[in-house]
Amino acid sequence: MAAAAAAAAEQQSSNGPVKKSMREKAVERRSVNKEHNSNFKAGYIPIDEDRLHKTGLRGRKGNLAICVIILLFILAVINLIITLVIWAVIRIGPNGCDSMEFHESGLLRFKQVSDMGVIHPLYKSTVGGRRNENLVITGNNQPIVFQQGTTKLSVENNKTSITSDIGMQFFDPRTQNILFSTDYETHEFHLPSGVKSLNVQKASTERITSNATSDLNIKVDGRAIVRGNEGVFIMGKTIEFHMGGNMELKAENSIILNGSVMVSTTRLPSSSSGDQLGSGDWVRYKLCMCADGTLFKVQVTSQNMGCQISDNPCGNTH
């Protein structure tokens, strides 16, 4: 091939250009293209893509990553809403918080009207107002309740109630003088000045007295029970019992009425004179009194029956 090319070159140079056949031109063109393609693909090595190392999150890991991103986005939106609500309620501005102040001493001061549900002060904390200003606490159609342990103070529209299992005391904060106390062993129970009546469901005490210039009135809407472990002693200049129903006196030994005793019989039930003693289910008694004021009853078994019975408590004097 080299010799033929050299001979052709010598012939072309001596006799002028030599015409090539169609086959020779095609072979020459193919060789040129092959050489060109080999130069273009120099350093290129074809590799199968399936054999390459795959990077990134694919399959289940990709789905899990998408779920985590969505969850973080939801939490970010909730955090943004809470931040906006806190900012709107507390009113944080360029000059700080417009609704409250925090002091180094631990004092939290509210500078405007605040709407709260339940307040839990810390141990030995104090809730109060500013100097020379009133502390106004208002409940929206609900009672205001102050509670510590079992002690509770409830302020309502028409009443104020205090409930305590250990007692209570009211004292002047300036003079520290006790105005009212339920510690009966140390202080005698007195109604505060200006209080005219005391409404209780049950009271346990040694004695109940009134002032020397006023009467002691005990009034009940239903039934009143006065009971003493060692007897009941009622003393006064004048003792009056007014009842709309029945009055029942019970004693283990005797009932003693000292002084002048008057019983109004106008409202006492009585049977008509024409009724027979044995008719019906009624059992009749006659009220009798001894000279010393002792009352006793005698069952009526016959007409015109008196109090002279053999076992009367008066002895020989009726």
UniProtKB/Swiss-Prot annotation:
A GO BP entry: vascular associated smooth muscle cell development
Intracellular or extracellular location(s): Cell membrane, Sarcolemma; Cytoplasm, Cytoskeleton
All ranges on the Cytoplasmic side of the membrane: 1-65
Modifications made to the protein after synthesis: Disulfide bonds are present.
TM ranges: 66-86
Keyword match Glycosyltransferase: no
Keyword entries, A-Z: Cell membrane, Cytoplasm, Cytoskeleton, Disease variant, Disulfide bond, Glycoprotein, Limb-girdle muscular dystrophy, Membrane, Signal-anchor, Transmembrane, Transmembrane helix
GO cellular component annotations of the record: cytoskeleton; dystrophin-associated glycoprotein complex; endoplasmic reticulum membrane; Golgi membrane; plasma membrane; sarcoglycan complex; sarcolemma
Pfam families noted in UniProt: Sarcoglycan_1
Topology term for the membrane: Single-pass type II membrane protein
Tissues in which the UniProt entry reports expression: Highest expression in heart and skeletal muscle. Low expression in brain, kidney, placenta, pancreas and lung. High expression in fetal brain. Also found in fetal lung, kidney and liver.
InterPro entries: Sarcoglycan, Sgcb
Region: Disordered, residue numbers: 1-32
UniProt superkingdom: Eukaryota
Residues listed as glycosylation sites in the UniProt record: N158, N211, N258
Positions with biased composition (Basic and acidic residues): 21-32
Side of membrane Extracellular, spans: 87-318
Disulphide bonds in the chain: C288-C314, C290-C307
Function as written in the Swiss-Prot or TrEMBL entry: Component of the sarcoglycan complex, a subcomplex of the dystrophin-glycoprotein complex which forms a link between the F-actin cytoskeleton and the extracellular matrix.
Family in the record: Belongs to the sarcoglycan beta/delta/gamma/zeta family.
UniProt disease annotation: Muscular dystrophy, limb-girdle, autosomal recessive 4: An autosomal recessive degenerative myopathy characterized by pelvic and shoulder muscle wasting, onset usually in childhood and variable progression rate.
Quaternary organization: Cross-link to form 2 major subcomplexes: one consisting of SGCB, SGCD and SGCG and the other consisting of SGCB and SGCD. The association between SGCB and SGCG is particularly strong while SGCA is loosely associated with the other sarcoglycans.
Protein name: Beta-sarcoglycan
Organism from which the protein derives: Homo sapiens
